[in-house]
Amino acid sequence: MAIAVNQLTHAQSIAEQDPVVDYMNAIDNIEAELSAYSIELSDLYLGLGKSLYSREEYENARRAFQRGMQIERVNYGLDSLTQAPYLISIADTESYLGNWDESQKALENLYTINTKAYGANDVRMLPVLDQLLDWYMSTYKERTPKGGYSNLVISERIAARMYDILKTDMPLDDPDAPDRYRRLGYLQYFIANHIKQHGEPSDSGLSISMAGSSGRPSSATTSHMHFRRGKLALEKVIEALVEQPDSTEIDQAMAIAELGDWYLVFGQKFSATQAYQLAFDVLETTENPEQARTELFSAPRLIEFSMDKSPEAVLSDKSSESQLELSMMISTYGVANQIEVTSSPQSLTENQLSKLRKDMRSKRFRPRLVNGLAAEAPHSMLYDQPTPKG
């Protein structure tokens, strides 16, 4: 045993020098001293797989991950939770090989072993559901529109599981509750935006067992369905913030304003106006109401329901060499007009300028609020330089 441990430690310490060879030598030594299924081997196979993966030797990496997982199963059982890092690594590797169905099988296996350990609706399922949602969202851009839609369908089913667990097992005063509900709301925008850009495939070809399918809704109701689901999640954010012991009026006002943003993006202008007015009024009990209102609502703000940011994140004020500076007027409905380029690293063609203006008009901004009511206002922002096509 001491020899095996020494080999493992030695392999780990010199892995950075020549990782693949060193891992293979350590594996050979442990197999010779102990057995082909010695538990000390599993970590070495995981390290070997990661080294091969970093070299883009994906088929060899997959074999290493599968071997490590097999050793875990022999030692700890077919449903052991120790398989988790191997299953995630296999899913990553299969995705790079273009085997998306195999990636999904590995992730379904990860979900299954956790449900067997905890139960499908146990709060301890949240970390693995987070991991699955992160995976499907991070690989979305690597897929075709139809493949990306498949990722989003699965992501929504994962989110439905998370929502059920949150409602049942996570009290609203839990510190994680606001961010968790917020992320579920943002996902609905992501899905609705994909459908707006690419349409909805008639057949996604999915058979994931995480939740049952209730059938495909008609195109006329799809947008409203995602609007409603996102609205419910963002309302839960507000409820959770009210229950937080350290929540401030500013936190609550920002969450209410974000609900107003949600209404505005989905064309519910009257409801957006009501939400913005409420957010403005909530600040009345702060130490310095006018200062808070000025800081939060005196200028337009681009509405972004991004899965990769917190609600407090704003556009950087620091321009880079590849960014343009734009000026515009933001209407009371959050639409950009009179869009002009005020500073550019290089001149734009008429076609590039036309596309830029079209893109900006498709975005929505939280309008400036004056006494709680939307008002037209000038706005400036940075914009990524269009990439020239050669």
Question: Residue ranges of each PLM-predicted region?
Answer:
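A generic tandem-repeat structural signature
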Residues: 59-140
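N-terminal leader/linker segments that initiate helical-solenoid repeat arrays
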Residues: 1-51, 55
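Heptad-repeat amphipathic alpha-helical coiled-coil interaction surface used
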Residues: 20, 27, 34, 41, ...
